[in-house]
Amino acid sequence: MGQFITLMQSIPEALNMAFNVALVIVSLLCVTKGLINLWKCGIIQLLMFLALAGRSCDGEYKIDRRHVLSHVEFNLTRMFDNLPQSCSINNTHHYYKGPENTTWGVELTLTNTSVMNRSDENVTSIRSLGFGNITNCDKTGEAGHTLKWLLNELHFTVLHVTRHIGALCRTTAGAGLLIQYNLTTSDKGGEVGRHLIASLAQIIGDNKAAWVGKCYNNCTSSGKCSLTNCEGGTHYKFLVIQNTTWPNHCSYSPMSTVRMIIQKTAYSSVSRKLLGFFTWDISDSSGQHVPGGYCLEQWAIVWAGIKCFDNSVMAKCNKDHNEEFCDTMRLFDFNQNAIKTLQLNVENSLNLMKKSINGLISDSLVIRNSLKQLAKIPYCNYTKFWYVNDTITGKHSLPQCWLVSNGSYLNETHFKNEWLWESQKLYNDMLLKEYEERQGNTPLALADLCFWSLVFFTTTVFFQLIGIPTHRHLIGEGCPKPHRLTSNSLCSCGFYKIPKKPFRWVRKGK
């Protein structure tokens, strides 16, 4: 009886506490709902749009309130610092720089004027370049390895030719390296000069194909002319190879060297599958490995700092093997392990790198990108990759290759559908993971029902609101996000260039 009386006496106190809690909850809900309504009505977005209309659109591309488009750009210079690197000033002057921090290089020049005269200096004909035997020609002592490697690739790897009647070299001691090919001379095995220039085009890249292709201009009596009998040749008569200093002739890149190494792989008709998996791990500032992902060190990327990707991204690489980003990651991983375990000289390092690239890079991807490059379709150069970054959780999507067209990277607007799709996939993966974690810890009970009921009620209230328009939308065009159109229908980023196009005001999300 006494316990019952005590219980009845405590009811008012309990009710008073419950009412206080209810008032706090209602107050929080009202404030929260008021802020949400203020944001959802569109007045803040309208003021921001009017303040920023016509400004530059070069900032980061925000997909939504938590996803932004980011990218990582690789620095391949250190990875391939034991390989010669090349660049081109124009269609006639090309350079190969020696490995690492050397100050010398090899210059390749296409010209119509011969630089050799048998009567003025010591000149010998090169009858055989078997095994890179250029001892009599190379008087520099330091460029020998690079020169032998270059000639071997030109003659054996690409051409399978060991002789060239029109090749001359200077043998004067102390005069430096000088080799001249007569591109108009052919031996009994075929038009070696024509094949030589075609192989040089493959090495330098498709963008230098302007001087590959010779046509005859046939004109009729009526004055009409047409190009006929086009061949894979050049109108230049001589290819001159000589040693030179390296005062930064042009911005060199190892990609031409990599293209030379993998060019046979690009034309392979048999596809390989990787036989093993790589162990991805994360390294802290002291170099200790911590499980949980993979970090690119400072030397591997263009800007300073360390960029890490979690295990979910790396797991996709180990599962599918069908992305250029995964190929590049395997090259970095191989390079890192090779540095730790191997002490090789330059030639052995080069041979090992050639075998590793042929064994690691997926044939199907190389073939696909090579065909795209030949067809003038945007292709991947294995250097720059974009990904979607969740600014709240720090999660990333699997990086995709940033395609190249006409020697420059595509603008973000050209692949907007791709990064929007990656954002949606990242959302789905995160929601699925959160749902599985919640189901594993607690079942969907009363708290979940209350939460989803509140979300449903709030959503139905929002549907009844009439919002304020937030931005200009060109009639008949896609949504201009994130372009800030002026009253003349223009944007300073240059994507919308036609003025006075009809537009209408729309609300965000419509």
Curated annotation (Swiss-Prot):
Keyword Transmembrane helix attributed: yes
Glycosylation sites: N75, N90, N101, N112, N117, N122, N133, N182, N218, N243, N381, N389, N406, N411
MF (Gene Ontology): metal ion binding
Gene Ontology BP annotations: fusion of virus membrane with host endosome membrane; receptor-mediated endocytosis of virus by host cell; virion attachment to host cell
Lipid-attached positions, N-myristoyl glycine: G2
Sites annotated Important for GP-C-mediated membrane fusion: K33
Residues on Extracellular side: 2-17, 54-58, 59-448
Disulfide bonds listed in the record: C87-C250, C295-C308, C317-C326, C380-C401
Cytoplasmic side: 33, 470-510
Residue ranges crossing the lipid bilayer per the database entry: 18-32, 34-53, 449-469
Entries under InterPro entries matching the protein: Arena_glycoprot, Arena_glycoprot_zinc-bd
Keyword vocabulary terms for this entry: Disulfide bond, Fusion of virus membrane with host endosomal membrane, Fusion of virus membrane with host membrane, Glycoprotein, Host cell membrane, Host endoplasmic reticulum, Host Golgi apparatus, Host membrane, Host-virus interaction, Lipoprotein, Membrane, Metal-binding, Myristate, Transmembrane, Transmembrane helix, Viral attachment to host cell, Viral envelope protein, Viral penetration into host cytoplasm, Virion, Virus endocytosis by host, Virus entry into host cell, Zinc
Residues reported to bind Zn(2+) 2: H471, H473, C479
Pfam families: Arena_glycoprot
Cleavage, annotated site positions: D58, G59, L275, G276
Residue numbers binding Zn(2+) 1: C57, H483, C491, C493
GO cellular component, one term: viral envelope
Domain notes: The cytoplasmic domain of GP2 plays a role in ER location. It also contains a zinc-binding domain that allows SSP retention in the GPC complex by accepting a cysteine from SSP as the fourth ligand.
Protein family: Belongs to the arenaviridae GPC protein family.
Its job: Stable signal peptide (SSP): cleaved and functions as a signal peptide. In addition, it is also retained as the third component of the GP complex. The SSP is required for efficient glycoprotein expression, post-translational maturation cleavage of GP1 and GP2, glycoprotein transport to the cell surface plasma membrane, formation of infectious virus particles, and acid pH-dependent glycoprotein-mediated cell fusion.
Name of the protein this chain belongs to: Pre-glycoprotein polyprotein GP complex
Taxonomic placement: Viruses, Riboviria, Orthornavirae, Negarnaviricota, Polyploviricotina
Gene field: GPC
